[in-house]
């Protein structure tokens, strides 16, 4: 894990050959949906493991079958809330949660419009109650313009959790700048920080639309405007 000196609290995993090889597979246009999903799970699992190293641990006495000794315990690891942004982040969350078995999970449906305004639409939020002991991890594969994450962070800023983290696959400097400008205390962990955004707001060289590549290109449902909350 490498701390990026351009920002406070921004880290990448460019020093991991395993993750760089996985990212290489994700970037390839020839990678099929199932392989793409599995790659996101692998990245989430590895990055989740690395996140545990940033948490507070305390010593505790334990009894083995032979004698008393000392172990460690992390209260932080037991107070994790993973917020997943539909739909691309599901495989990433699947990997993350393997390191945080007790984690609560929140779901946010948010989508970004096209250039030039990149308007964010958020039409579904279901997130557990948050408190000052929680470590909140927002999983979103791509930090492009940062507008989606800023909208999501604004929804939960008043809950004042212990830590707010963003975990992603790729980020553009423009997106990190935007998020940090509004939420300087938010920590960002990504596999790699790419070069820039193109005129359409996509990360380049990037890996394309993570949601489409993980689950397939969406069907254009003509009845969608008439659909209501299914709960």
Swiss-Prot record:
Instruction: Write the lineage as a comma-separated list.
Output: Archaea, Methanobacteriati, Methanobacteriota, Methanomada group, Methanococci
Q: Which reaction does it catalyse?
A: UMP + diphosphate = 5-phospho-alpha-D-ribose 1-diphosphate + uracil
Q: Does the keyword Nucleotide-binding apply?
A: yes
What is the free-text note on the cofactor? Answer: Binds 1 Mg(2+) ion per subunit. The magnesium is bound as Mg-PRPP.
Query: What protein am I looking at?
Result: Uracil phosphoribosyltransferase
Origin: domain of life: Archaea
InterPro entries membership:
PRibTrfase_dom (IPR000836), PRTase-like (IPR029057), Upp_A (IPR034331), Ura_phspho_trans (IPR005765)
* Residues noted as binding uracil in the record, renumbered to the chain: 203, 208-210
Q: How is its activity regulated?
A: Allosterically activated by GTP.
